Amino acid sequence: MKRKLLSLVLSVAMVATMLTGCGNSASSGSAQKVGVAMPTKDLQRWNQDGSNMEAQLKAAGYAVDLQYASNDIATQVSQIENMINSGCKLLVIASIDGDSLGTVLEQAKEKKIPVIAYDRLIMNSDAVSYYATFDNYMVGTKQGEYIKQKLDLDNAAGPFNIEITTGDPGDNNARYFYGGAMDVLKPYIDAGKLVVKSGQIDFETVATANWSTETAQSRMDAIICKLCRRNKVRRLPLL
Protein backbone atom coordinates (compact mmCIF):
# COMPACT_ATOMS: atom_id res chain seq x y z
CA MET A 1 0.00 0.00 0.00
CA LYS A 2 2.83 2.42 0.86
CA ARG A 3 4.47 1.76 -2.51
CA LYS A 4 1.24 2.36 -4.40
CA LEU A 5 0.76 5.61 -2.47
CA LEU A 6 4.31 6.65 -3.33
CA SER A 7 3.68 5.90 -7.00
CA LEU A 8 0.50 7.97 -6.83
CA VAL A 9 2.23 10.92 -5.19
CA LEU A 10 5.06 10.77 -7.72
CA SER A 11 2.52 10.79 -10.54
CA VAL A 12 0.86 13.90 -9.13
CA ALA A 13 4.25 15.54 -8.67
CA MET A 14 5.17 14.75 -12.28
CA VAL A 15 1.88 16.24 -13.48
CA ALA A 16 2.62 19.52 -11.72
CA THR A 17 6.23 19.58 -12.93
CA MET A 18 5.37 18.79 -16.54
CA LEU A 19 2.56 21.31 -16.80
CA THR A 20 4.66 24.01 -15.20
CA GLY A 21 7.55 23.16 -17.50
CA CYS A 22 5.25 23.60 -20.48
CA GLY A 23 4.14 26.99 -19.23
CA ASN A 24 0.79 25.60 -18.12
CA SER A 25 0.83 26.42 -14.44
CA ALA A 26 -2.58 26.15 -12.79
CA SER A 27 -2.06 29.59 -11.29
CA SER A 28 -1.78 31.27 -14.68
CA GLY A 29 -5.40 32.03 -15.52
CA SER A 30 -7.99 29.30 -15.87
CA ALA A 31 -7.24 25.87 -14.46
CA GLN A 32 -5.45 23.52 -16.84
CA LYS A 33 -7.17 20.16 -17.35
CA VAL A 34 -5.57 16.77 -16.72
CA GLY A 35 -7.07 13.58 -18.12
CA VAL A 36 -6.88 10.55 -15.81
CA ALA A 37 -7.81 7.23 -17.43
CA MET A 38 -8.29 4.30 -15.05
CA PRO A 39 -9.12 0.74 -16.14
CA THR A 40 -12.09 -0.16 -13.95
CA LYS A 41 -14.15 0.65 -10.88
CA ASP A 42 -14.56 -3.04 -10.06
CA LEU A 43 -11.37 -3.14 -7.98
CA GLN A 44 -11.02 -0.96 -4.90
CA ARG A 45 -7.41 0.00 -5.62
CA TRP A 46 -8.34 1.71 -8.91
CA ASN A 47 -11.21 3.55 -7.22
CA GLN A 48 -8.83 4.75 -4.53
CA ASP A 49 -6.06 5.68 -6.93
CA GLY A 50 -8.43 7.58 -9.21
CA SER A 51 -10.19 9.49 -6.45
CA ASN A 52 -6.95 10.26 -4.59
CA MET A 53 -5.25 11.51 -7.74
CA GLU A 54 -8.28 13.63 -8.60
CA ALA A 55 -8.35 15.15 -5.10
CA GLN A 56 -4.63 15.95 -5.10
CA LEU A 57 -4.70 17.48 -8.56
CA LYS A 58 -7.74 19.61 -7.73
CA ALA A 59 -6.06 20.72 -4.51
CA ALA A 60 -3.08 21.80 -6.62
CA GLY A 61 -5.39 23.92 -8.79
CA TYR A 62 -5.95 21.69 -11.83
CA ALA A 63 -9.20 20.62 -13.43
CA VAL A 64 -9.53 16.84 -13.76
CA ASP A 65 -11.30 14.60 -16.25
CA LEU A 66 -11.36 11.22 -14.44
CA GLN A 67 -12.70 8.24 -16.40
CA TYR A 68 -13.07 4.52 -15.70
CA ALA A 69 -13.35 2.13 -18.65
CA SER A 70 -15.01 -0.97 -17.11
CA ASN A 71 -12.02 -3.01 -18.30
CA ASP A 72 -13.11 -2.48 -21.91
CA ILE A 73 -10.26 -1.56 -24.25
CA ALA A 74 -12.43 0.19 -26.84
CA THR A 75 -14.04 2.28 -24.08
CA GLN A 76 -10.66 3.36 -22.75
CA VAL A 77 -9.43 4.29 -26.22
CA SER A 78 -12.57 6.38 -26.76
CA GLN A 79 -12.18 8.07 -23.37
CA ILE A 80 -8.56 8.99 -24.08
CA GLU A 81 -9.50 10.32 -27.50
CA ASN A 82 -12.18 12.50 -25.89
CA MET A 83 -9.64 13.78 -23.36
CA ILE A 84 -7.28 14.74 -26.16
CA ASN A 85 -10.01 16.52 -28.11
CA SER A 86 -11.51 18.27 -25.08
CA GLY A 87 -8.36 20.19 -24.24
CA CYS A 88 -6.55 18.09 -21.65
CA LYS A 89 -2.97 19.31 -21.33
CA LEU A 90 -1.62 16.07 -19.88
CA LEU A 91 -2.77 12.44 -19.68
CA VAL A 92 -2.27 9.97 -16.83
CA ILE A 93 -3.16 6.48 -18.04
CA ALA A 94 -3.45 3.16 -16.21
CA SER A 95 -3.93 1.02 -19.28
CA ILE A 96 -6.17 -2.01 -19.61
CA ASP A 97 -3.96 -3.43 -22.34
CA GLY A 98 -0.53 -1.90 -22.73
CA ASP A 99 -0.35 -2.94 -26.38
CA SER A 100 -3.61 -1.31 -27.51
CA LEU A 101 -3.07 2.43 -27.11
CA GLY A 102 -0.44 3.19 -29.74
CA THR A 103 -2.83 4.69 -32.29
CA VAL A 104 -4.76 6.95 -29.94
CA LEU A 105 -1.56 8.14 -28.25
CA GLU A 106 -0.23 9.22 -31.64
CA GLN A 107 -2.98 11.85 -31.48
CA ALA A 108 -1.65 13.01 -28.12
CA LYS A 109 1.87 13.15 -29.52
CA GLU A 110 0.74 15.22 -32.51
CA LYS A 111 -0.82 17.74 -30.13
CA LYS A 112 2.27 17.65 -27.89
CA ILE A 113 0.28 16.36 -24.92
CA PRO A 114 2.58 14.60 -22.42
CA VAL A 115 1.57 11.12 -21.26
CA ILE A 116 2.32 9.42 -17.93
CA ALA A 117 1.87 5.63 -17.88
CA TYR A 118 0.60 4.95 -14.37
CA ASP A 119 1.45 1.59 -12.78
CA ARG A 120 1.06 -0.34 -16.06
CA LEU A 121 3.61 0.07 -18.83
CA ILE A 122 2.27 1.26 -22.19
CA MET A 123 4.14 -0.50 -24.98
CA ASN A 124 4.44 -0.02 -28.74
CA SER A 125 4.30 3.76 -28.39
CA ASP A 126 6.91 6.51 -28.17
CA ALA A 127 4.31 9.00 -26.92
CA VAL A 128 4.85 8.10 -23.25
CA SER A 129 6.89 10.70 -21.37
CA TYR A 130 7.12 8.95 -17.97
CA TYR A 131 6.31 5.62 -16.34
CA ALA A 132 5.23 5.85 -12.67
CA THR A 133 5.51 2.47 -10.98
CA PHE A 134 7.31 0.55 -8.25
CA ASP A 135 9.30 -2.69 -7.87
CA ASN A 136 6.82 -5.17 -9.34
CA TYR A 137 9.23 -8.09 -9.07
CA MET A 138 9.48 -7.49 -5.34
CA VAL A 139 5.67 -7.47 -5.10
CA GLY A 140 5.73 -10.95 -6.60
CA THR A 141 8.39 -12.17 -4.19
CA LYS A 142 6.33 -10.81 -1.28
CA GLN A 143 3.34 -12.82 -2.49
CA GLY A 144 5.48 -15.93 -2.77
CA GLU A 145 7.03 -15.35 0.65
CA TYR A 146 3.56 -14.96 2.18
CA ILE A 147 2.51 -18.37 0.86
CA LYS A 148 5.84 -19.88 1.94
CA GLN A 149 5.35 -18.53 5.47
CA LYS A 150 1.67 -19.47 5.83
CA LEU A 151 2.29 -23.06 4.67
CA ASP A 152 5.57 -23.24 6.62
CA LEU A 153 7.14 -24.82 3.56
CA ASP A 154 10.59 -25.17 5.10
CA ASN A 155 9.28 -27.26 8.01
CA ALA A 156 5.86 -28.72 7.21
CA ALA A 157 5.72 -32.22 5.76
CA GLY A 158 3.34 -31.43 2.92
CA PRO A 159 2.68 -31.97 0.12
CA PHE A 160 0.30 -29.08 -0.52
CA ASN A 161 -1.87 -28.79 -3.61
CA ILE A 162 -1.70 -25.38 -5.26
CA GLU A 163 -2.91 -23.81 -8.49
CA ILE A 164 -1.49 -20.65 -10.02
CA THR A 165 -3.16 -17.74 -11.74
CA THR A 166 -1.63 -14.47 -12.82
CA GLY A 167 -2.60 -11.29 -14.66
CA ASP A 168 -2.94 -10.06 -18.21
CA PRO A 169 -0.21 -11.23 -20.62
CA GLY A 170 -0.18 -7.77 -22.19
CA ASP A 171 0.55 -6.11 -18.84
CA ASN A 172 4.28 -5.89 -18.17
CA ASN A 173 3.59 -5.85 -14.42
CA ALA A 174 2.00 -9.30 -14.50
CA ARG A 175 5.20 -10.87 -15.77
CA TYR A 176 7.19 -9.33 -12.93
CA PHE A 177 4.59 -10.38 -10.33
CA TYR A 178 4.64 -13.92 -11.69
CA GLY A 179 8.44 -14.04 -11.94
CA GLY A 180 8.93 -12.85 -8.37
CA ALA A 181 6.41 -15.29 -6.91
CA MET A 182 7.66 -18.25 -8.93
CA ASP A 183 11.28 -17.59 -7.97
CA VAL A 184 10.17 -18.19 -4.38
CA LEU A 185 7.74 -21.06 -4.99
CA LYS A 186 9.29 -23.06 -7.85
CA PRO A 187 11.96 -24.76 -5.69
CA TYR A 188 9.14 -26.20 -3.57
CA ILE A 189 7.25 -27.25 -6.71
CA ASP A 190 10.38 -28.96 -8.07
CA ALA A 191 10.89 -30.71 -4.72
CA GLY A 192 7.30 -31.98 -4.66
CA LYS A 193 6.27 -30.10 -1.54
CA LEU A 194 3.95 -27.91 -3.62
CA VAL A 195 1.98 -29.88 -6.19
CA VAL A 196 0.31 -28.23 -9.19
CA LYS A 197 -2.06 -31.06 -10.12
CA SER A 198 -3.27 -29.39 -13.29
CA GLY A 199 0.31 -29.12 -14.52
CA GLN A 200 -0.43 -25.53 -15.53
CA ILE A 201 2.61 -23.52 -14.47
CA ASP A 202 4.07 -21.49 -17.36
CA PHE A 203 3.10 -17.84 -17.62
CA GLU A 204 1.16 -17.98 -20.87
CA THR A 205 -1.01 -20.82 -19.57
CA VAL A 206 -1.86 -19.24 -16.21
CA ALA A 207 -2.25 -15.65 -17.49
CA THR A 208 -5.68 -13.99 -17.27
CA ALA A 209 -6.70 -11.69 -20.13
CA ASN A 210 -7.51 -8.14 -18.99
CA TRP A 211 -7.12 -9.20 -15.34
CA SER A 212 -10.69 -10.50 -15.54
CA THR A 213 -11.81 -11.95 -12.20
CA GLU A 214 -14.59 -13.81 -14.02
CA THR A 215 -12.11 -15.48 -16.38
CA ALA A 216 -9.78 -16.39 -13.50
CA GLN A 217 -12.65 -17.84 -11.49
CA SER A 218 -13.96 -19.83 -14.45
CA ARG A 219 -10.54 -21.36 -15.05
CA MET A 220 -10.06 -22.20 -11.38
CA ASP A 221 -13.55 -23.70 -11.11
CA ALA A 222 -12.80 -25.95 -14.08
CA ILE A 223 -9.49 -27.07 -12.55
CA ILE A 224 -11.04 -27.73 -9.15
CA CYS A 225 -13.97 -29.68 -10.59
CA LYS A 226 -11.70 -31.83 -12.73
CA LEU A 227 -8.76 -32.51 -10.44
CA CYS A 228 -9.32 -31.48 -6.86
CA ARG A 229 -12.67 -32.87 -5.69
CA ARG A 230 -10.97 -35.22 -3.24
CA ASN A 231 -8.19 -32.91 -2.13
CA LYS A 232 -7.86 -29.71 -0.16
CA VAL A 233 -6.74 -26.83 -2.36
CA ARG A 234 -4.61 -23.81 -1.50
CA ARG A 235 -5.00 -21.01 -4.05
CA LEU A 236 -2.40 -18.47 -5.01
CA PRO A 237 -3.83 -14.93 -5.00
CA LEU A 238 -4.17 -13.28 -8.42
CA LEU A 239 -0.60 -12.13 -9.13
Briefly describe each language-model feature range.
Residues 17-21:
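C-terminal motif of bacterial Sec signal peptides marking the signal peptidase cleavage site
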Residues 11-13:
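Repetitive helical segments and hydrophobic/amphipathic motifs
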Residues 2-8, 22-239:
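A residue-level marker of the well-folded mature domains of exported/periplasmic proteins
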